[in-house]
Amino acid sequence: MAVTMRQMLEAGVHFGHQTRFWNPKMAPFIFGHRNKIHIINLEKTLPMFNDAQKYVRQLAANRGTILFVGTKRQSRDTIAQEAQRAGMPYVNARWLGGMMTNFKTLKVSIKRLKDMEAAVEAGELEKMSKKEALLFEREIAKLQKSIGGVKDMGGIPDAIFVVDVGYHKIAVTEANKLGVPVIAVVDTNHSPEGVDYVIPGNDDSSKAVALYAEGVADAILEGRANAVNEVVQAVRGDDEYVEENA
């Protein structure tokens, strides 16, 4: 379902940062200021968000992987929830340097996590001493927190969706280095450079974060559904062709 201007207003997408912290590169997306707070021009944000959703829809229809990134306190739960709903990987605890540029190392950690989870399933914990079990549980909890959201990501993602480019500068830099497209929410205090699909908007409000994440997840699910429908239609068409020529 398409996001409306009213929904953006209600979520506070238009509230930027204090004027003294602004980044001049965001000037084209700023409407003005009120009480020393920059106001983002939603007439720019809405079509740009629609463009980002269109791109995500196409990517998902082609079975692409979009990595959700949002590690700030107010976005963690939403990022995990919406990524899981869309069947996509996510990082919501801390971006570990090299998560994309040094994927080989990440794969080693993912294997370790999966092996440990398999050991738990097999009841291996019961065979351990109390101390061994405690250390094991601590390690698995740490791994689940840091890489649990990417354990099923088979390789470098086809795109990343980031909430707050300043806070996740390393993630954006790694994506740029590898030529991975970046879809990102950029507030008035950051630069839109290095972002392929800029969504000018508030990156602190939990309501605004929910609006972006839900919109991206919805676009992924729509893209996948469209792809399935096309396959069904093609199969139906083939069946009709066979019947006609039978």
Curated annotation (Swiss-Prot):
GO terms for cellular component: cytosolic small ribosomal subunit. Pfam families: Ribosomal_S2. One of its GO terms (molecular function) is structural constituent of ribosome. The keyword Ribonucleoprotein applies. Keywords: Ribonucleoprotein, Ribosomal protein. GO terms for biological process: translation. PROSITE patterns: RIBOSOMAL_S2_1 (PS00962). HAMAP family: Ribosomal_uS2_B (MF_00291_B). Belongs to the universal ribosomal protein uS2 family. This is Small ribosomal subunit protein uS2. It comes from Burkholderia thailandensis (strain ATCC 700388 / DSM 13276 / CCUG 48851 / CIP 106301 / E264). The gene is rpsB.
